[in-house]
Amino acid sequence: MDLKKILPKNGPPINEVSKYIEKYKNDLIVIKYGGNVFIDRKIFDNFITDISILNKLGISFAVVHGGGPRIKRELDKSNIQSKFIRGLRVTDEKIINIVESVLIDFNNDIVDSLKKFGTDAVSIHTKKNNIIKVTPEAKELGFVGIPNKIDNNLICLLYTSPSPRD
């Protein structure tokens, strides 16, 4: 692989990159992408470019993302005032539908943007393939829960497949 063709001109030295490719080539890297980053499209586009480069270098990854600011904006648009108990947002059915919709939109934006760069990407979310099992935190919190099991079969299947598909 010719790293000079893949790496940005202002990127790190090739010998540094080679060292990390070798170190992580058999691992699945989990990247947490906060919802605040979605506010600035330029930062988002840079993130997509960087992830696409990792993919071209043979690094496997999973992106876990948030959506806090957009969730708040959508709740405000719907005139929904959030209530908090012990620092946790009380989440009724109306709120969970908005949260889910925002997060799925972000998820699709990430996947579609990666595909435009030639990166195989698959969307995993609650409406399609809910892999996270939770225990409700407390009845008064509504849909707030504690993750207690992640069914990683789908993740493992995608990680070992040569070309993931939706």
What are these regions (language model features)?
Residues Y159-D166:
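Conserved small/polar residues in nucleotide/adenosyl-binding loops
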Residues K4-N15, R41-I48, H65, R89, ...:
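Electropositive phosphate-/nucleotide-binding environments in soluble metabolic enzymes
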Residues D76-L158:
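Ligand-binding beta-strand-loop-alpha-helix segment within the catalytic cores
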Residues M1-A62:
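N-terminal glycine-/serine-/threonine-rich phosphate-binding loop
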Residues V37-I39, P69-K72, N129-K133:
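Short, active-site-adjacent cap segments at secondary-structure transitions
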